[in-house]
Design a protein with these regions (language model features):
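Conserved HGGG/HGGXW glycine-rich cap/lid loop of the alpha/beta-hydrolase fold
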Residues: 17-65
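Generic recognition of short, well-ordered alpha-helical segments
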Residues: 38, 42, 109, 243, ...
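Asparagine-centered polar/low-complexity signal
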Residues: 33-36, 100, 125, 272
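Two-component system phosphotransfer/interaction surface
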Residues: 272-276, 280
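Conserved residues at beta->alpha junctions
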Residues: 31-34, 235, 266
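Short alpha-helical
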Residues: 25, 35, 42, 105, ...
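Flexible "cap/lid" subdomain of the alpha/beta-hydrolase fold that forms the substrate-access gate
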Residues: 2-6, 12, 16-18, 54, ...
Length: 281
């Protein structure tokens, strides 16, 4: 059974939600945008008989309110957040880290800074390297000009109208692998969630800053030299094409035909198997 709890990180003035299930070696899962900890429920159910699975809402997503302006979404701040959560829930042993999408950016930075706390890493459909040609809406979200900020604000507001109908229509076209249940969940947790939408704009303005990915090559090398690492990548991803599956540098790369961007939702059993393989390495 998956248990949820809310924790307050006083040192960061942040409240977040943590989901846990099972006992055993720890699997720590980082969600992407525009998702939250619920992304990992199906994977956790697959693993809970052998592992202690832990995931969290990054600040501003899911049931975590938008953080104060003092939290900048820099890699340094996000590493501090992860460390604070792990301290609060008393995680003291090395973990198997599983990352997706924007969670891969945070996860790569955290893992590289904490190889002694890392047992292995599994990467799925993420951007953790320099030179990625960002899609148009991400570029707009990251644009700090007044006109772009206004367009982004209006666009985010429109996504929540009529129960997120516009969002669901757009997202269904971008992610045809997702069913109506997941589209409804995204509409509720993101399109109708003002905190999550404001957080997205704040986060992408940080991601798009020159030099954000400057040190990622060195980070990846540090991780690959320290622990087992595998990539499991959903093909037919409209956001991050399959050619980037090899960009992280892992020797073991599995491509899932037509699984799309959200492997944790479309192929949780395959992802769980990859995690178990890393645990046995």
């Amino acid at each position: 059974m998956i248990e949820a709890r809310s924790i307050v990180l006083n040192e960061l003035a942040i409240r977040t939600r943590v989901l846990e299930a099972g006992k055993g070696p720890i699997v720590l899962l980082f969600h992407g945008n525009p998702d939250n900890a619920d992304e990992w429920r199906l994977v956790m159910e697959q693993l809970a008989d052998k592992f202690r699975c832990i995931t969290l809402d990054f600040p501003g997503y899911g049931q975590s309110p938008e953080p104060p302006v003092s939290f900048t979404y820099s890699l340094t701040d996000q590493i501090r957040f992860v460390d604070a959560v792990l301290k609060a829930i008393q995680v003291n042993e090395p973990v198997i880290l599983v990352v997706h999408d924007t969670g891969g950016m945070v996860g790569t930075a955290w893992a590289a800074a904490n190889t002694d706390r890392l047992r292995g890493m599994v990467v799925t459909n993420t951007v953790a390297f320099d030179g990625f040609a960002w899609f148009a809406i991400a570029q707009q979200w990251g644009d700090t000009s007044l006109v772009a900020r206004l367009r982004s604000w209006l666009g985010m507001a429109a996504l929540g109208l009529r129960g997120g109908a516009l969002f669901k229509r757009i997202f269904a076209q971008q992610c045809p692998q997702l069913g109506s249940k997941e589209l409804d969940r995204f509409a509720s947790s993101f399109a109708q969630n003002g905190d999550a939408k404001r957080t997205t704009l704040r986060q992408f303005r940080q991601i798009m800053q020159p030099g954000f990915f400057r040190d990622f090559a060195a980070m990846r090398e540090r991780i690959l030299a320290a622990v087992p690492c595998r990539v499991i990548w959903g093909d037919n991803d409209r956001f991050i094409p399959v050619r980037f599956a090899h960009a992280f540098g892992c020797k073991q790369v599995t491509i899932l035909p037509d699984a799309g961007h959200w492997v944790a939702l479309t192929a949780p059993d395959a992802l769980a198997r990859e995690i178990a393989i890393v645990a046995q390495a």
